[in-house]
Curated annotation (Swiss-Prot):
Residues 829-944 form the RdRp catalytic domain. One of its GO terms (biological process) is viral RNA genome replication. GO terms for molecular function: nucleotide binding; RNA binding; RNA-directed RNA polymerase activity; serine-type endopeptidase activity. The keyword Metal-binding does not apply. This is Protein P1-P2. It comes from Turnip yellows virus (isolate FL-1) (TuYV). Its EC number is 3.4.21.-, 2.7.7.48. Precursor from which the RNA-dependent RNA polymerase (RdRp) is probably released. RNA-dependent RNA polymerase plays an essential role in virus replication (Potential).
Length: 1035
């Protein structure tokens, strides 16, 4: 029986193995069965692999299933095991599903319970904490109310202990780390400074700037050489007056930094040497590069110097200057010019050499600043301005006189400069209450240089106390006070006087001034401000226009009749003077020289006739002219900007920072006003006020502020009004510009022009338009004049002396790369002299636009406000309203034409002439107006395409002079000058002023002819000798 059970168990096991193997085989092979194969019972239990499927379609017929009783035990066991496995899998899946649902439900319940528990815990903690705080405050209040004194004592002890612990912690923990970090930071900054590109070089010669050096000592011997301890030269310093009664030594900071053992040396033959270590710092700035030092007692006497006055940055003006240096032959003075600002530095045109640092720039006897170095990128030197330190470099109770030509720095730049000396300003405020030990300033005592005046009333009876004028007086300390101040000065604390220590006399003057002003205000009603008055002037001038077009308008090609102004100009016809007729009658050879010339016609009819003739020729040339492509124009614009690069300048101060402000505008306005030609005509419509010249407005204290307001109003309108689509009349009616007066120039004309009626017309702009142009362009134009040797434009040179002629020829020789003798003798091998006929009328609108692009590219700090103002100015000058002498207004239809009386005419004409040469293929060119010298060959056909009528001269001719030698240039218009001389004056009238003017003109003409002694002698006998015997009153 036992053996049967064992056999049955073994049989079941083997059957189970076979079943598992067959099932696995079926699972592996079932994926390879054809899709159309039918399932047959017993197929899963076959162990042999199925044969490859046939290509043909097979049809199987399933047999009827056999009864279970006919199956073998193996098949039955396999079926039982498969059934068991299937049931087990189903039960397992069901159990797994139930378990998953139970887990998810349990997890959700646990999460909800946890959130609830945390919330209850936090609220419980909040209640506990608030209860503790409430209990603490209650306990603290109970302690304070019942034990007040002990509690406050404990609080005080706790505070003291806390800060003691912090102090000890800082001393033994934070302080060493702080010292190490500071040292590391200094090393890092030093390394960065050594690696970085310097902002300025120490010395530089300015390209194109002509300076001169003359033997001259500094004012008051106030410039002091600084040397190394070894005696080698290191730089310069200067002795200046301070407003606290002291004298200070001023030098450049980098001189002291580079020379730690510097010594001040007397330059007056004395052997005194004072180490600068004996001096103590008053004010210092590394970035500002100015250091003020307080010296030991009587240091000025030991060095043999006196103190000079200074101008601070707030009042620094663009002006002429001089800089002093000491060479082996003594002191010399070099010419310089203050031209603008660069950040907190001042741009200076000057020639300097090694060792000039620290030397002051002077205007007259006043120090303007300290030489700092040269710009690393720009064509100019840099001067460190003197900061305005109340009580030191500027007064605390009076205002310094405003610089006559406007300030160099805008208000924001001045604030930045003063910020460099913030520590000094702080010490100034702390020392305002200083009073000398004696109780009285030495300046309030008698001074050797004071001059006193006495009236007759002072001579009778008791003599009254003498009072001296107190204007701009600086108090001087007694030498003992100076010594005590120097001895107790640690180099940081500076004793500075303030307004509280004002002298009694000055306080009395101030009080009387306030009282007098109060009296005036009580008697005289308030006057209108200049702004209000300027508004009334604008309305008055606008009322003069009549914009109604007459029924029979005057027709001019390129212009339309648009209105009328009252007639203010009545030009008189010039006639040949009786003096000239007498001279020609006595000297027939003089008549031969002056034949072929005559005076033109004057008046509106002559103006209209000439205008029609020239305008028709202008339109004819303009129609045949071709405008270059955009690429060609850009090429010439960039090339022009490159050759004019030495004349890069700052834009107007008026729009610095992108905004037009009154204070900055006044900087430019003052400079513009003082550079005007005072005797020039004021033009339309301002002539209606009855003052015909600039002088009448500029020198009138009441009209000058109004003129400033009128100019400022115009600039504001140019910024605010949409001018882009306005015509000439609209520009005038909207107050963006004034009409341009047209008149015939009062100079002799050739007979051919007189017969044709082609007179030379002048288009003169108004005073306000002049000022607007000067505000926008004066920096650039003046820089071009100063640096004419470095750029193609030559408006700044002259040919009145042999030295000037040689100077120009040397510049020309450098341009062509040869010697002066060679370029004059064989000029055809190097250049072509050309002249353009009717140049002003040939200037097209696109040429003016390209010239403005070059101007903008040469402006360092160009901003949208400056660009818009210049664009509006260009729109107005290209689309003008001309006014004849009888008041007829003619609006320009086609834009263009250079206006001969504009402030920019000389500068722009020269540059446009150079650009025209570049358009025709010239490699280089130099021009003065319409005259030009350019590289070979000149392409006249290309000029004609541009609309110019250009002719080549057969001689080396430039600016109406023919060059015969490097220092010899003969005028071309000799006969024209003589005609104007003899027929334009009438010294026979006996008027002293007429005779004086005639003789001055004679000597000017004779100077032009100086290289022909025989001609000069002959003309002298003809023109001068008959006048000399006359007695001229006042001589």
């Amino acid at each position: 029986m036992y053996s049967k059970l064992m056999f049955f168990f073994a049989l079941c096991s083997i059957s189970f193995l076979f079943t598992s193997e067959a099932a696995s085989t079926m699972l592996l092979e079932s994926s390879y069965l054809p899709l159309n194969q039918s399932y047959a019972p017993g197929f899963l239990y076959k162990r042999d692999m199925l044969p490859p499927p046939l290509q043909a379609v097979l049809t199987y017929t399933c047999p009827e299933p056999r009864p279970l009783a006919e199956e073998s035990y193996n098949d039955l066991l396999r079926a039982i095991s498969q059934k068991s496995s299937s049931d087990f899998q189903n039960a397992y899946s069901l159990a797994l599903s139930f378990s998953s649902d139970f887990y998810q439900h349990g997890l959700k319940t646990l999460k909800d319970v946890s959130f609830l528990a945390v919330e209850k815990f936090l609220w419980g903690l909040t209640r506990l904490w608030s209860s503790l705080i409430l209990a603490s405050f209650s306990a603290l209040w109970w302690l304070v109310s019942n034990f007040t004194t002990p509690v406050f004592c404990l609080a005080l002890l706790y505070t003291v202990t806390k800060y003691m612990v912090k102090t000890v912690s800082f001393l033994f923990g934070g302080l060493p780390i702080w010292i190490i970090s500071i040292a590391f930071s200094l090393l890092k900054k030093s390394f960065s400074a050594l690696r970085s590109t310097p902002k300025c070089l120490y010395e530089k010669a300015i390209d194109g700037f002509k300076s001169f050096t003359i033997p001259q000592s500094p004012p008051k011997s106030c410039v002091i050489p600084i040397t190394h301890a070894s005696g080698n030269h290191a730089g310069y310093a200067s002795c200046i007056k301070l407003y606290n009664g002291e004298n200070a030594l001023m030098t450049a900071t980098h001189v002291l930094r580079d020379c730690p053992n510097a010594v001040a040396v007397s330059a007056k033959g004395l052997k005194t040497r004072i180490p600068l270590a004996e001096f103590k710092t008053i004010a210092k700035s590394d970035k500002g590069d100015v250091t003020l030092l307080r010296g030991p007692p009587n240091w000025e006497g030991l060095l043999g110097c006196k103190a000079a006055n200074v101008i601070t940055a707030a009042n620094l003006a663009k002006c002429k200057a001089s800089i002093y240096s000491f060479d082996r032959d003594g002191w010399v003075s070099s010419y310089a010019e203050i031209v603008g600002s660069e950040g907190t530095d001042v741009m200076v045109l000057s020639h300097t050499e090694g060792g000039h640092s620290g030397s002051p720039y002077f205007n007259g006897k006043t120090i303007l600043g300290v030489h700092s170095g040269a710009s690393a990128t720009g064509n100019y030197n840099l001067m460190a301005p003197i900061p305005s330190l109340p009580g030191l470099t500027s007064p605390t109770y009076v205002f310094e006189t405003t610089a006559p030509q406007g300030r160099v720095f805008a208000q924001e730049d001045i604030a930045e400069i003063e910020g460099l000396y913030a520590q000094v300003m702080k010490r100034v405020q702390q020392a305002e209450d200083f009073k000398p030990k004696t109780g009285k300033y030495w300046g309030d005592m008698e001074d050797d240089e004071d001059i006193f005046f006495e009236s007759k009333e002072d001579l009778s009876g008791k003599r009254s106390a003498r009072h001296r004028p107190r204007n701009k007086r600086r108090r001087q300390l007694h030498p003992k006070d100076k010594q005590r101040r120097w001895e107790r000065d640690d180099g940081e604390n500076n004793l500075i006087s303030s307004g509280k220590d004002k002298s009694r006399e000055h306080r009395e003057e101030s009080d009387r001034g306030d009282l007098r002003e109060s009296d005036e205000n009580s008697e005289i009603p308030p006057q209108k401000s200049p702004k209000e008055t300027a508004g009334e002037f604008e309305r008055y001038f606008s009322s003069l226009y009549n914009w109604e077009v007459p029924t029979s308008p005057r027709e001019v090609p390129g212009f339309r009749h648009c209105g009328k102004l009252p007639q203010y100009y009545h030009p008189k016809q010039k006639e040949e003077s009786s003096w000239g007729k007498t001279l020609v009658g006595n000297h027939p050879a003089l008549g031969e020289k002056t034949s072929g010339f005559g005076w033109p016609k004057f008046g509106p009819e002559a103006e209209l006739k000439s205008l029609r003739l020239q305008a028709s020729r202008w339109l004819e040339r303009a129609q045949s002219a071709e405008i270059p492509s955009d690429a060609e124009r850009e090429r010439v614009i960039q090339k022009t900007a490159d050759v004019y690069h030495p004349c890069q300048t700052n834009g107007p101060a008026a729009t610095r920072g992108g905004t037009l402000t009154w204070n900055n505008f006044m900087i430019d306005f003052k400079q513009a006003v003082f550079s005007l030609e005072f005797d020039a005509g004021i033009e339309l419509p301002y002539i209606a006020y009855g003052k015909p010249t600039h002088r009448g407005w500029v020198e009138d204290q009441k009209l000058l502020p109004i003129l400033a307001q009128l100019t400022f109003f115009r600039l504001q309108k140019m910024l605010e009004v949409n001018f882009e689509d306005m015509g000439p009349e609209e520009l005038v009616r909207n107050g963006l510009c004034d009409p341009i007066r047209l008149f015939v120039k009062g100079e002799p004309h050739k007979q051919a022009k007189l017969d044709e009626g082609r007179y030379r017309l002048i288009m003169s702009v108004s005073l306000v338009d002049q000022l607007v142009a000067r505000v926008l362009f004066q920096n650039q134009n003046k820089r071009e004049i100063a640096l004419w040797r470095a750029i193609p434009s030559k408006p700044g040179f002259g040919l009145s002396t042999d030295e000037q002629v040689l100077d120009f020829v040397e510049s020309l020789a450098r341009q062509v790369g040869t010697t002066t003798t060679e370029v004059v003798a064989n000029w055809k091998n190097y250049l072509t002299p050309t002249d353009c006929s009717g140049f002003d009328w040939s200037v097209a609108d696109w040429m003016l636009h390209d010239d403005m692009i070059v101007r903008n590219r040469l402006t360092i700090d160009l901003n949208p406000a400056t660009e818009r103002l210049r664009s509006c100015w260009l729109r107005c000058i290209s689309n003008s309203v001309l006014c004849l002498s009888d008041g007829t207004l003619l609006a320009q239809i086609h834009p263009g034409v250079q206006k001969s009386g504009s402030y920019n005419t000389s500068s722009s004409n020269s540059r446009i002439r150079v650009m025209a040469a570049f358009h025709t293929g010239a490699i280089w060119a130099m021009a003065m107006g319409d005259d030009a010298l350019e590289s070979n060959p000149a392409d006249l056909a290309a000029y004609k395409k541009l609309g110019f009528k250009v002719e080549v001269s057969g001689q080396l001719e430039f600016c109406s002079h023919i060059f015969r030698a490097p220092d010899l240039a003969l005028p071309v218009n000799e006969n024209k000058m003589i005609y104007k001389l003899i027929y334009g004056y009438n010294p026979g009238s006996g008027n002293a002023e007429v005779v004086s003017n005639y003789l001055a003109a004679c000597f000017s003409v004779l100077n032009e002819l100086r290289h022909d002694p025989a001609s000069v002698e002959l003309l002298y006998s003809w023109l001068v000798d008959p006048v000399l015997p006359q007695k001229i009153p006042g001589e």
